[in-house]
Amino acid sequence: MPKEENALITLTNAGIRRDRKWLVRGITMSVNSGEIVTLIGPNGSGKTTTAKIALGLLGINEGTTSRKNNLRIGYVPQKLQIDWTVPIKVKRFISLTHKISDKEIEFALSLTNTSHLSDKEIRVLSGGELQRVMIARAIALSPEFLVLDEPVQGVDYKGEDAIYNLIEETRTKIKCGILL
């Protein structure tokens, strides 16, 4: 396990229970700057729950969690909850919930090779294009810690390879810790 004193996030024997059932238990891990940590397991094994614990979105019933103070986090959820009838263009979508400069948006779109999509509506994007735009949205926040939950879900084989290459390039260029 990586050095915990420099970790962006650390989980130690973390567990979360609903009613009498443990969703995950005994999770110990840390993520440092510039490293990629991948959660592997079948559907329903607790990967998303573990990611949400690391993000601080779910409280734990046992164990401990710690995060670097003022940690900047980017998050790409497994499923996007959006009203597809609302016409919203990519550039606006990226800055929808945070004040982000045009320069930051352009950098994120360029890094994810989606600059050509900036004036397209979200609802017309392919699965791979949407995933890359979602990653651009997270990158635009200049995260130190980036969490991507099932980043290649709904993407064809060729698109999967492109997204994994993008994740590696993101780690290299912005030096963030990444949890997949």
Positions of PLM-derived features:
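Helix-to-loop junction immediately C-terminal to a conserved catalytic motif
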Residues: 55
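Catalytic Walker B motif of ABC-type/P-loop ATPase nucleotide-binding domains
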Residues: 146-150
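Conserved catalytic motifs of ABC-family nucleotide-binding domains
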Residues: 142
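Conserved ABC ATPase signature
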Residues: 121-125, 129
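Conserved ABC ATPase "signature" region
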Residues: 14, 102-119
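Hydrophobic anchor residue at the start of the ABC signature
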Residues: 135
